[in-house]
């Protein structure tokens, strides 16, 4: 495989890419004019569609897709069918808030199942998410919100580490002070009364039907933005795209981590 990837990189990566669903097949695998390179030209797809719907259509609706182990030891399993249902519900809610293709959504949440739903639902409708580590403070969060030109913030109110609660709400509230963006709160500590432009995560999830469908986007359409730590200056946003990330990540998981269907 390694030799094949060197001798015929376009044939090699094209074969891996064709394992996925393409709403519109790509016409060319790679266009490389230094320093720019573009993958799967002309193709349209959606990474979340391929992660969920494609597997449901393959007969894996009742197979466990996500296993979540909480801080308190609680375990929760979601099948592909259950996960798709929740993603569609949340995606419907996000669309009703005016979030759509190309919009940036910053996610400032603890390591929870709901955080995964937020990422999947955002990408499902062609929006671009940027996860900010819940250990970062006010200035770091605000800087990333501004740089990404976020339209929406999805934030947790509290995070738990080694059994102790860490207040996220006050950090998030200070970070968005005077900024014109909507906020969805994942509330665990207590259910606060929310002002205009602020919404409850669970109400957005369970208060909407699973009617959203995947937004098919260009292979080079941004999937998410991942910021560097900013230890040597302003944080730099690394952009990953639907086509390349979907194909590259699958290849690495199957080849180097030996992940199999079962």
Language model features by range: what are they?
Residues 1-78, 82-85, 89-92, 176-178, ...:
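N-lobe entry segment of adenylate-forming
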Residues 48, 62, 66-120, 137-142, ...:
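Conserved AMP-binding/adenylate-forming core of the ANL superfamily
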Residues 62-64, 184-186, 196-227, 234, ...:
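Conserved pre-ATP/AMP-binding loop-to-beta segment of ANL
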Residues 72, 155-219:
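ANL superfamily adenylate-forming
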Residues 105, 122, 222, 228-231, ...:
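Conserved S/T- and glycine-rich ATP-binding loop of Class I adenylate-forming
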Residues 110-111, 140, 154, 221, ...:
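Hydrophobic, small-residue-rich alpha-helical packing segments that form membrane-like cores
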Residues 119, 136-177, 248-262:
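Conserved ATP-dependent adenylate/AMP-binding module captured primarily in the ANL superfamily
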Residues 126:
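Structured binding elements
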